[in-house]
């Protein structure tokens, strides 16, 4: 059984948009990322499925990259029912370091933090450069946003 067939059999791949990716998955040597926000200083059960999937890819010869959402961690991330407590830069830095220390025990990996390439972008530059790619109708129709709007959060 190939790696792709195994991942599909396990229900970890639902469909693909490009058949060429099958050979790349089976061959190995791809770099992939596992992303997480530094909302806490420890890995937890919510990370389990993604990390097991990542470990399987690593065992097949692919290279994991841990992507920490330091910028997202400072802003907060919408939850369906409540506001998330905003964390300070110091808290997200501490949490990111702790998460990376734990992840590197599981993987031979590097870590990048999206805060590093986003913190110097001013709001006008961001909106002009990236805002055009955000569709407000799409965002409003997301269930998380809908439920927050309906509940007044």
Regions found by a protein language model. Give the residues of each.
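NTP-dependent nucleotidyl-transfer catalytic core
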Residues: 1-153
């Amino acid at each position: 059984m190939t790696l792709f067939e195994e991942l599909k059999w396990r229900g970890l791949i639902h469909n693909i948009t490009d058949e060429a990716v099958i050979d790349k998955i089976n061959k190995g040597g791809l770099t992939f990322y596992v992303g997480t926000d530094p909302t806490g200083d420890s890995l937890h059960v919510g990370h389990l499925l993604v990390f097991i999937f990542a470990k399987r890819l690593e065992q097949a010869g692919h290279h994991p990259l841990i992507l920490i959402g330091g910028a997202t961690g400072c802003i907060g991330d919408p939850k369906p029912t409540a506001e998330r407590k905003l964390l300070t830069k110091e808290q997200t830095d501490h949490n990111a370091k702790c998460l990376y220390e734990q992840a590197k025990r599981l993987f031979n990996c590097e870590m990048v933090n999206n805060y590093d390439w986003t913190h110097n972008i001013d709001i006008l530059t961001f909106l002009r450069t990236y805002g055009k790619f955000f569709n407000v109708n799409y965002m409003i129709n997301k269930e998380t946003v809908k439920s927050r709007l309906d509940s007044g959060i």
